[in-house]
Amino acid sequence: MNAKDLRDKTVDELRDELANLKKESFNLRFQQATGQLENTAGIKAARRNAARVKTILNEKAAAAAE
């Protein structure tokens, strides 16, 4: 997921994407705690993707406020 693709989405789509990423992050952390997670890089990727979505949401909010 890159920022260019995210900028093309609507605010509602971004909020849905953020909710999905938070669920995914929770599931990955739960798997890590129970010892089932094999690819620990997924936690970092989910966290960074959530940060990207939040950044784009803030950019859109700032643009709408102007």
UniProtKB/Swiss-Prot annotation:
It holds the Pfam family Ribosomal_L29. GO terms for molecular function: structural constituent of ribosome. Transmembrane segments: none annotated. InterPro entries: Ribosomal_protein_uL29, Ribosomal_uL29, Ribosomal_uL29_sf. One of its GO terms (cellular component) is cytosolic large ribosomal subunit. GO terms for biological process: translation. Coiled coil: none annotated. Keywords: Ribonucleoprotein, Ribosomal protein. The keyword Secreted does not apply. The keyword Kinase does not apply. It comes from the Bacteria. Belongs to the universal ribosomal protein uL29 family. HAMAP family: Ribosomal_uL29 (MF_00374). This is Large ribosomal subunit protein uL29. It comes from Ruegeria sp. (strain TM1040).
